Amino acid sequence: MHLLIAAAGSGSRMGADRNKLLLKVAGKTVLEWTLKAAFEAKTISWIGIIGQPKDKNPICSILDNSVKAVQWINGGSTRQQSVQLGLAALPNDAKSVLIHDGARCLVRSFVFDEISKIVSKGQSVIAASQVTDTIKKVDIDGEIIESPPRSDLWAAQTPQGFPVNKLKHAHSEAISKGWNVTDDASLFERLGLPVKIYDAGPSNIKVTTPFDLVIAESLLSTLKD
């Protein structure tokens, strides 16, 4: 299985002066924890890291002792553009691909493997967690419009897995129609293509804020070598 890791995030919401993936948590950088799970996943054979040129040296220094093939890919100005560039850099024989946020450093290796198994059958699937809070839809004035049933709501996560040809087609359609989305599954939704859910649990968070770092520190401390 081929894996693309989106690693172009800034540290603005974290209040950091560097890419948040280079911040330390429980003794390793955020990216190192993400890569640890990817390296341990039995199904992952090739990894591409999509990042900004300014981060290439510090990120590549982390890869010195990689146990799997890892390729650096220059990213774009948005996540969507970065994934497009990542897809263009895939080996010609890539049939399926997983897209993963580098900031989801609590992902477990078995999540990569389970999603890989589903994608290998030609299906599209995303990691997700069922919503436990009551969600409110509000109008422009902040007044509640409705409360969708929690049983219908899932918080999208990564990895997200797709057949390469279908994902490339979806991104091509996005370019031609001017679609801007925050995850790849949204493109499939717009095209009416089916995407399944894999329950990865609530711990597979994306480290975005200082509070997320506290949670990650607590959970990852139990996994230290």
From Swiss-Prot:
Reactions accelerated catalytically: 2-C-methyl-D-erythritol 4-phosphate + CTP + H(+) = 4-CDP-2-C-methyl-D-erythritol + diphosphate
- CDD domains assigned: CDP-ME_synthetase
The processes (GO biological process) annotated in the record are: isopentenyl diphosphate biosynthetic process, methylerythritol 4-phosphate pathway
Which positions does the site annotation Transition state stabilizer cover? 13, 20
The pathway that the record names for this protein is: Isoprenoid biosynthesis; isopentenyl diphosphate biosynthesis via DXP pathway; isopentenyl diphosphate from 1-deoxy-D-xylulose 5-phosphate: step 2/6
Report the domain of life of the source organism: Bacteria
A molecular-function term among this protein's GO annotations = 2-C-methyl-D-erythritol 4-phosphate cytidylyltransferase activity
Please state what class of enzyme this protein is. transferase
Which keywords describe this protein according to UniProt?
Isoprene biosynthesis, Nucleotidyltransferase, Transferase
Q: Where is this site: Positions MEP for the nucleophilic attack?
A: 150, 206
- PROSITE patterns, alphabetized: ISPD
The protein's Enzyme Commission number: 2.7.7.60
Function, please? Catalyzes the formation of 4-diphosphocytidyl-2-C-methyl-D-erythritol from CTP and 2-C-methyl-D-erythritol 4-phosphate (MEP).
Database matches in HAMAP family: IspD
NCBIfam families, alphabetized: ispD (TIGR00453)
Query: What is stated as this protein's family in its record?
Result: Belongs to the IspD/TarI cytidylyltransferase family. IspD subfamily.
- By what name is this protein known? 2-C-methyl-D-erythritol 4-phosphate cytidylyltransferase
Biological source species: Prochlorococcus marinus (strain NATL2A)
Gene name of this polypeptide: ispD
